[in-house]
Amino acid sequence: MAEEKTYPMTAEGLAKLQAELDDLITNKRPAITSRIQEARSFGDLSENSEYQSAKDEQAFVEGRVKQLQQMIQFAQVIDASSASKNVVTLGKKISFKEVPDGDEETYTIVGSAESDPLSGKISNDSPMGKALLDHKTGDKVEIPLPENHSVTVEILHVSKAK
């Protein structure tokens, strides 16, 4: 039997996935079912754009529900407090600057299921996340960029994410 993929994530990330799943099941599904029933009442389904739109949305929601159930079932919640204080691991907040004179940047390392770079959460599977993992405060780390370029950063601070 094939081994199931695990989804490393923080407790906060797991809670967000569970909240999204609950919303889809308790709110979205019933709303879509109502839309489908209403669209059916319009008659001929072959040229009924409201019906087709609702069915498309239903398929999307059902796919997302299955995806969330899979990720929640095989979630591996990482406790950042058990790791060494100054070492970059999943669930840690990290500040670094580009060497020699870059601006300071701060990110939290999270599992790919909860990654959101625009809000400062980078995946442990991203090139940056992979490069930073297991390094500590004061380390200089080379982060790969596209087209065989790279940038060197110095880790300034590592702490447990809030």
From Swiss-Prot:
The keyword Zinc-finger does not apply. Keywords: Coiled coil, DNA-binding, Transcription, Transcription regulation. The keyword Transcription regulation applies. Residues 111-132 are annotated as: Disordered. One of its GO terms (molecular function) is DNA binding. One of its GO terms (biological process) is DNA-templated transcription elongation. Pfam families: GreA_GreB, GreA_GreB_N. PROSITE patterns: GREAB_1, GREAB_2. Transmembrane segments: none annotated. Residues 48-76 form a coiled coil. Belongs to the GreA/GreB family. Necessary for efficient RNA polymerase transcription elongation past template-encoded arresting sites. The arresting sites in DNA have the property of trapping a certain fraction of elongating RNA polymerases that pass through, resulting in locked ternary complexes. Cleavage of the nascent transcript by cleavage factors such as GreA or GreB allows the resumption of elongation from the new 3'terminus. GreA releases sequences of 2 to 3 nucleotides. This is Transcription elongation factor GreA. It comes from Oenococcus oeni (strain ATCC BAA-331 / PSU-1). The lineage of its organism: Bacteria, Bacillati, Bacillota, Bacilli, Lactobacillales.
